[in-house]
């Protein structure tokens, strides 16, 4: 047993080190940037060290557990622990946040506050993925919202206040249901609240009550994931946010919803999940088609990419609803895969906006001639997004397909129907993704304009793009990198279900 508090250090380090930023000189933008990047790198190295030397892959139980009494009156503990399901998102968080701080290099206005908020988000995200206490999970979930709201409302585009208000209304509204579910589960059947994940997993509830809890949690995760029809905050938020914030939103924030769906709804409420799972699959299928057919109608480049995120999260929801080994593993792989691809697309959209100052696709055109590096990277990630074989998106979607087809829970006709509709969604994906590339990069519109000389991406931007591209290719060629983390845990979760 390892008694060193690794997880506490990993969760607390970014926000506590971030609070020291305010002691740095106000005008020292360079010092602030380097300090933030060093903190992020140190955190990423810590996570990697703990993963390599203190984490056993073949053990589906909770590892590196820490349990400290916090508030005695209602038995509230600082309880952390990781398993195969949470290690993937934690590594993804470390990786994407480090690159997002590097992407935020051009920001000079109020840079102390900006970098502090990014580090506060970092703590909230890792805390959510590693907490083993329902109330602690809720607190970490909420810790995420305030930094995002401020990052949106202070460093966003023209309609930033509208989109920030919409974001906070949606997510805070969803969090009310999360809090009600957490308190309901904690207080059920005893005078003393039991907020421990392990105790809650062994607790049995009346079916009606379990369905109510499940539905409450589902609303909270549906806002965050997002699941239609609670997705409308996402395109507005992505359309206005600075691209480094978009990287964190698309890469990590949306994954917290899918993670919560597996961690709480599947693990703690298995009966309700087997009732709701057909509906999840139907909604996921509608979501893929709806978002893929809405996306081509968007003029705003970032909104178009945001709708592609909604479409890709549909695969995760279908995988979670299939209740099979392959389906759930595919969903976990899609979470990681889309974390990389979504973050990269928003980063490249933002860097091209920095140069041409245009956000509407019908005003762009001909950028490829003057910016070949951005063109190459954007095209590569568009291919990854439309699930080109050899890239991570293809493997994830293929495994989800396999999960549906092998699911014994559903009859043959519904399975064929869902697979057919998903296939239509996969055909629509290249349509919006390739037309987006065509409108941006081909033609002569900007090339013929006066002062049409634009700078191509510099070493910093190339480094960020290539750093994200390598794992996308790596997972596409050898998906066991990610699957080996979660495969034992997925089996342990599915052992609660009658269907296998």
From Swiss-Prot:
EC number: 7.1.1.-
GO cellular component, one term: chloroplast thylakoid membrane
Highest taxon of source: Eukaryota
A GO biological process held by the record: electron transport coupled proton transport
Subcellular location: Plastid, Chloroplast thylakoid membrane
Bilayer disposition of the protein: Multi-pass membrane protein
Reaction equation(s) it catalyzes: a plastoquinone + NADH + (n+1) H(+)(in) = a plastoquinol + NAD(+) + n H(+)(out); a plastoquinone + NADPH + (n+1) H(+)(in) = a plastoquinol + NADP(+) + n H(+)(out)
Protein name according to UniProt: NAD(P)H-quinone oxidoreductase chain 4, chloroplastic
